[in-house]
């Protein structure tokens, strides 16, 4: 049983808590504290009620600075300086760093200073972290000495399992990616100021291009893909679920059936629970609360001239990613136990 804490109780932090209670992993992981600079009443309310994922099946209540979930008591903290958090006193093995702010090694190590043994960052990180992990692809590379780890991004987790399968079966020469991403909380409800002029505009009224370093994130997990991919990203007026338009040029000549068969076999076999495959006529909301990292939409696979393949991938950018946070945390703990 590992003792964990969540720092930053926003969309991903709350999804991590819910995923822990829905995934059957509570026998392996105990949540002892949440640090969030918000009123405890608001923390409890947003645990119980969620516009995207519905009401929580376990009723949360507040009593003397503790959030109670069934028989569990979780300490609520509101401490701005991560280095001052009481992780040593609480005997915290691992911190889920979900603020979106402490994304490089130096800032994330504040949790180690505070007494935690390991940190898992819910965001792409600087190159000097001990590891960047896409669970199901490179988690076997984790070592006991890895203390500050990044869980990459939701879109990297969606793409990399698919690219890995395609490369192993057919060889990938190059690729281009467009992420069609749901709106996020760094956008505006109505027009307001932002450093990114496109993000000054109302999220519910426009398709909004944003910068992305997704291609570089792929290279970090699959070094053989260096300089082979480029990516753009647009935000769309939905609150959850992301689609990814993936185009790749393959070494091997293929057809639609061959590509889909390879991906379906992986989804049914070695990548089960991480990669999914569907040939049903589904839309984005059908993938809400889907715990997998990526689902291939086989109905949208296209092949041009035998080598250029276009595909559509789906992911719940909150729920799938939160479930991988749990998987990666347990994988980190397992290296310590070896």
Curated annotation (Swiss-Prot):
Swiss-Prot/TrEMBL keywords: Cytoplasm, NAD, Oxidoreductase, Pyridoxine biosynthesis
GO cellular component entries: cytoplasm
SUPFAM superfamilies in the record: Glyceraldehyde-3-phosphate dehydrogenase-like, C-terminal domain (SSF55347), NAD(P)-binding Rossmann-fold domains (SSF51735)
Binding positions (substrate): 153-155, 199, 212-213, 235
One Gene Ontology term of the molecular function aspect: NAD binding
UniProt catalytic activity: D-erythrose 4-phosphate + NAD(+) + H2O = 4-phospho-D-erythronate + NADH + 2 H(+)
Enzyme class: oxidoreductase
Origin: domain of life: Bacteria
Tagged with keyword Electron transport: no
InterPro entries: E4P_DH_bac, GlycerAld/Erythrose_P_DH, GlycerAld_3-P_DH_AS, GlycerAld_3-P_DH_cat, GlycerAld_3-P_DH_NAD(P)-bd, NAD(P)-bd_dom_sf
Intracellular or extracellular location(s): Cytoplasm
Gene3D superfamilies reported for this sequence: Dihydrodipicolinate Reductase, domain 2, NAD(P)-binding Rossmann-like Domain
EC number: 1.2.1.72
One biological process term in Gene Ontology: pyridoxine biosynthetic process
Pathway annotation: Cofactor biosynthesis; pyridoxine 5'-phosphate biosynthesis; pyridoxine 5'-phosphate from D-erythrose 4-phosphate: step 1/5
Site (Activates thiol group during catalysis): 181
Active site: 154
Annotated positions binding NAD(+): 11-12, 317
Physiological role: Catalyzes the NAD-dependent conversion of D-erythrose 4-phosphate to 4-phosphoerythronate.
Protein family per UniProt: Belongs to the glyceraldehyde-3-phosphate dehydrogenase family. Epd subfamily.
NCBIfam families with a match to the protein in the record: E4PD_g-proteo (TIGR01532), PRK13535.1 (NF010058)
Subunit structure of this chain's protein: Homotetramer.
Name by which UniProt lists this protein: D-erythrose-4-phosphate dehydrogenase
Annotated source species: Shewanella amazonensis (strain ATCC BAA-1098 / SB2B)
The gene coding this protein: epd
């Amino acid at each position: 049983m590992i003792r964990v804490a969540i720092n930053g109780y926003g969309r991903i932090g709350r999804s991590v808590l819910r995923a822990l209670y829905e995934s059957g992993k509570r026998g392996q992981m105990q949540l002892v504290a949440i640090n969030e600079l918000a009123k405890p009443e608001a923390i409890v309310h947003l645990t119980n009620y969620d516009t995207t994922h519905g009401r929580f099946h376990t009723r949360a209540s507040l009593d003397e600075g503790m959030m109670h979930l069934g028989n569990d008591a979780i300490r609520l903290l509101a401490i701005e300086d991560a280095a001052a958090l009481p992780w040593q006193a609480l005997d915290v093995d691992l911190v889920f760093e979900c603020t979106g702010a402490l994304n490089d090694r130096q800032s994330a190590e504040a949790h180690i200073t505070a007494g935690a043994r390991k940190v898992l960052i819910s965001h792409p990180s600087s190159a000097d972290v001990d590891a960047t992990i896409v669970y199901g692809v490179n988690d076997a590379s984790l070592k006991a000495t890895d203390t500050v780890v990044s869980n990459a991004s939701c879109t990297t987790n969606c793409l990399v399992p698919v690219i890995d399968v395609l490369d192993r079966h057919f060889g990938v020469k190059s690729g281009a990616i467009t992420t069609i991403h749901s709106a996020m909380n760094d956008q505006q409800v109505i027009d307001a100021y932002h450093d990114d002029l496109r993000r000054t505009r109302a999220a519910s009224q426009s398709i909004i291009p944003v910068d992305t370093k997704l291609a570089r994130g792929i290279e970090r997990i699959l070094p053989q893909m260096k300089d082979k991919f480029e990516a753009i990203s647009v935000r769309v007026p939905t609150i959850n679920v992301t689609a990814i338009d993936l185009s790749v040029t393959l070494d091997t000549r293929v057809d639609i059936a061959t590509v889909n068969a390879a991906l379906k076999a992986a989804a049914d076999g070695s990548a089960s629970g991480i990669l999914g495959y569907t040939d049903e006529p589904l839309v984005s909301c059908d993938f809400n609360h889907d715990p997998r990292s990526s689902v291939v939409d086989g109905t949208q696979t296209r092949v041009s001239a035998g080598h250029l393949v276009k595909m559509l991938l789906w992911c719940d950018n909150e729920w799938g990613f939160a479930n991988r946070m749990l998987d990666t945390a347990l994988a980190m703990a397992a290296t310590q136990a070896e």
